[in-house]
Amino acid sequence: MTFKILSIDGGGIRGIIPAVVLEEIEKIIGKPISSLFDLVAGTSTGGILALGLAKPNPYGLPEHSAHKLVGLYDSEGTNIFHRSFFHKILSLGNLSNAKYPTRGLEDALDRYFGEAMLSETLVDLVIPSYDIEKRLPIYFTSYFAKGRPGFDHKMRYVAQSTASAPTYFKPFKLRTGSDVGHLSLIDGGVFANNPTLAALSEATGSCGARIGNLFIVSLGTGQGARPISLKRAANWGLVG
């Protein structure tokens, strides 16, 4: 039996690109993304999309369509990536502090996820993050959230953990129910911007899928096409 995986890369505001692709898939097939795949992996902005598509409403149906999540970038983008003049002064123009305060991101995630837990997702998820104190990759998975209460966290906390990009947002302190106490988490894109490998590991491990039965859809967020000449690169320094 084919085991279907969706993998969504990180990429900040460019997450609107895979969001639009997923919107078209839902429109053409007429079914929610959560019913089309057995496992969804997402990093950073891709993690927010994955969580959004898997969040249930009170009736056990998807709370957010891909179309609604496309709107997230239009309606919330300016709030998430907003910094006051006062913040610019305190951070010395991003030299001494994160570029953006976390309030805008936290408010947006609260509106979209509320108190929903990772264990409640409509489809199994894998969401990478990174613990800067322990220097270890962290994988939030629905599988462990459902089987081990200590691994279950609010979806909005998981979303903030995978999206706290260094220099843009301060690390997210996630309190745990274990002896560890807390995790100091940053954007999973620092080691797994494309979470396909994490999805493969989860599929063949926790989910018990066979490698020969996997079908993977991997969505990126585009890339810069501006070439850099060898001559220019040869003169790179700290200020130019």
Predicted regions mapped to residue ranges:
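Core residues of folded domains in eukaryotic genome-function proteins
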Residues: 1-6, 37-39, 123, 135-136, ...
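Patatin-like phospholipase
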Residues: 2-5, 14-108, 144, 152, ...
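Extended hydrophobic secondary-structure segments that form protein cores and membrane-embedded regions
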Residues: 5-8, 38-44, 72, 125-130, ...
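Active-site gating loop/helix substructures
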Residues: 13, 120-205, 232, 238
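Generic structural signal for well-ordered alpha-helical scaffold segments
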Residues: 22, 26, 109-114, 160, ...
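Short, structural beta-strand-to-alpha-helix junction motif
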Residues: 32, 112-122, 154
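A short acidic (Asp/Glu
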Residues: 52-53, 195-196, 226-230
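Terminal low-complexity/disordered tails
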Residues: 209-240
